[in-house]
Swiss-Prot record:
Gene3D superfamilies: Globins. GO terms for cellular component: blood microparticle; haptoglobin-hemoglobin complex; hemoglobin complex. Residues 2-146 form the Globin domain. This is Hemoglobin subunit beta-2. It comes from Lycodes reticulatus. The keyword Transferase does not apply.
């Protein structure tokens, strides 16, 4: 993947302004509520019986933060995201058996959550760069499934 200087700046700018403790949980909670079938991977996380239960679940919140921090690896290795995520792809496919379509669902929920937080600053150009970044991450996480 080729990144322009502008794309790199936009992506790094988004993450430099993020409150991981806020955005990570909100994105994962949104995914689990909007796409309830994704909850099947979180059975050990406790009560997921309602939107309120999911929203108040501390294990879900902590995992949302972990997922968001996991994107830091991609930020640090933007020119080699596929290789950077090779082990995570194996983990999610062979150990956790996560449906790779769920990566895109979470990416969409993350985009919505960040756009809501950034408001008018989340311009179409910002979305283009961010979408490209997440598409590469989603592809890398799903690579083991091919």
């Amino acid at each position: 993947v080729k990144w322009t200087d502008k794309e790199r700046a936009v992506i790094l700018g988004i993450f430099s302004g993020l409150d991981y403790e806020d955005i990570g949980p909100k994105a994962l909670v949104r995914c689990l509520i909007v796409y309830p079938w994704t909850q099947r991977y979180f059975g050990a996380f406790g009560n997921l019986s309602s939107a309120a239960a999911i929203s108040g679940n501390l294990k879900i919140a902590a995992h949302g933060v972990k997922v968001l921090h996991g994107l830091d690896m991609a930020l640090q290795h933007m020119d080699n995201i596929m290789e950077t995520y090779a082990d995570l792809s194996i983990l999610h496919s062979e150990t956790l058996h996560v449906d790779p379509d769920n990566f895109k669902l979470l990416a969409d929920c993350l985009t919505i959550t960040i756009a809501a937080k950034m408001g008018h600053c989340f311009t179409p150009d910002t979305q283009i760069a961010f979408h490209k970044f997440l598409a590469v991450v989603v592809s890398a996480l799903g690579k083991q499934y091919c």
